[in-house]
Each structure stands twice: as C-alpha cells, then as structure tokens.
From Swiss-Prot:
GO biological process: mitochondrial translation; ribosomal small subunit assembly; translation
GO molecular function, one term: rRNA binding
Lineage, broadest ranks: Eukaryota, Metazoa, Chordata, Craniata, Vertebrata
Chief place of localization: mitochondrion
Name of this protein: Small ribosomal subunit protein uS7m
Keyword Ribosomal protein in annotation: yes
InterPro entries: Ribosomal_uS7 (IPR000235), Ribosomal_uS7_dom (IPR023798), Ribosomal_uS7_dom_sf (IPR036823)
Entry keyword annotation includes Cell cycle: no
Record's subcellular location: Mitochondrion
Keywords: Mitochondrion, Ribonucleoprotein, Ribosomal protein, Transit peptide
C-alpha cells in the first residue's frame, strides 16, 4: 500500500535523481522571484502560454535564499559581491558595490554634461550596463592547464567554460583593485576606475587577459597534449 501511494506521489515529492546535489526531480519548475508587469494572454507566445499552463499543474521549486523580487537585483553583481566578500562581511561588500555603481554614475553623468551635444548619445550612463560590458571585456577566451607528459609539465592551451571565464574576469578585477591601490585610495574608487577602463577595453585587467592569450599562442605547439 505504501509503495503504491509513493508511486502516485512520485512526481510531486523530492527524490533522488541524476542531477548532483538536487533535492527536486526534473518534474519541478524553476521559481520566478521577479514580479514583472502582467502581460495579457494575447501578447504571449505559444511557448509562454504552454509554460503558464504548466505552472498551474506542476510544483515549483523553493526560491533560493539570495533571490529577490527587487528591480535592482542583478545575478552577475550578486556573484561579484560574493567573490569580493572577505571574512563573511557581506554588508561591507554590498556597500562597496553600491558606492562603486554610484561613483560610475556620477562620473558618466559629469562626462555627459561636459561633452558636446553631438557626442552625448555615445556616452553610457547606466552603471549596470557598464559593469556587464566591463566583465564581458575582461573574460579570457582560452586558458592554460598544467599537464604532465614524460615526467615534464607543459602549459597547454585549453578552452574555458563560461563559468570559468566569468570567474577569472571577476578574480582579476578584485585582485587588481586590492593589490595595486595607490596611497589611501578607497576600494570603491579603485574599482570604479578599473571598471570604466575595462569598459573602454583598457586597463591592467585587459592587459592581463591579453598576456594570457599571448602565452596560449606561444604554447600552441603543446595543444595536442590536451587529449591526455
């Protein structure tokens, strides 16, 4: 009797599945914490209508602790804050990020008003767009892996996953801001400078990415060692 009841409730109850560290089976739908403006059924695409109907009959996963319905939340910025956090002080890391975005906004608005009218449209004043583009410019395309062959280690060029590329870009940015500050420059001031430089494809982080690409190009003779 218990086995038959469990068989009936199987799609609705969390159970073991092939996905690592997952409490839910694939029958569960992902949550949507963002509460955007409602859209009429006539404006929805067939795929959106089908997903809307599935939400009425299929269970939804529990939202993550860091999820929020705020219009100012950004997954990429949240990841950057978590990486910048030191000794568990997330309030400080979040405050630094807020001051950084505010500083970028002030600098860009000042630049906007000082520029002639013909060039104002080329100036980006949205700090979120600047942050995203700066991170995209800092992402390396290819990396190096240490592989042993015949008792000797070789630096072999290997392709990078999207998560690894994002991690390296954020790590380089944070390391640059912590180690190369001049005098008593505050963290948010240095971070805003580096983000604006990376947005323009300039700065030490962009140089570090290019150096990595040059090393990968120099070691391309060892590329066949990737299939070890």
């Amino acid at each position: 009797m218990a086995a038959s009841v469990r068989h009936l409730l199987k799609p609705w109850t969390p159970s073991l599945c092939l996905m690592r560290w997952s409490r839910y089976n694939p029958y569960y739908l992902d949550p949507e914490p963002r509460k955007d403006a409602p859209v009429s059924d006539s404006e929805l695409s067939p795929e959106q209508k089908e997903l809307q109907e599935l939400k009425t009959v299929r269970p939804i996963k529990a939202a993550l602790t860091g999820d929020t319905s705020s219009a100012f939340s950004d997954p990429l910025i949240s990841k950057f804050i978590n990486m910048m956090m030191y000794d568990g002080n997330k309030v400080l890391a979040r405050g630094i990020m807020t001051q950084t975005l505010e500083t970028i906004k002030r600098k860009q608005v000042e630049k906007y008003h000082k520029s002639p009218a013909a060039k104002r449209e080329e100036i980006e004043c949205n700090p979120y767009a600047i942050f995203h583009q700066a991170m995209e410019n800092c992402k390396p395309v290819i990396g190096l892996a240490s592989i042993q062959k015949g008792g000797k280690f070789y630096q072999v060029p290997v392709p990078l996953t999207d998560n690894r590329r994002r991690f390296m870009a954020m790590k380089w940015m944070i390391t640059e801001c912590r180690t190369n500050k001049q005098g008593r420059t505050l963290m948010y001031e240095k971070l805003s400078q580096e983000l604006l430089a990376a947005f323009a494809n300039e700065g030490n982080v962009i140089k570090r990415k290019h150096d990595l690409h040059k090393m990968a190009e120099a070691n391309r003779a060892y590329a066949h060692y990737r299939w070890w």
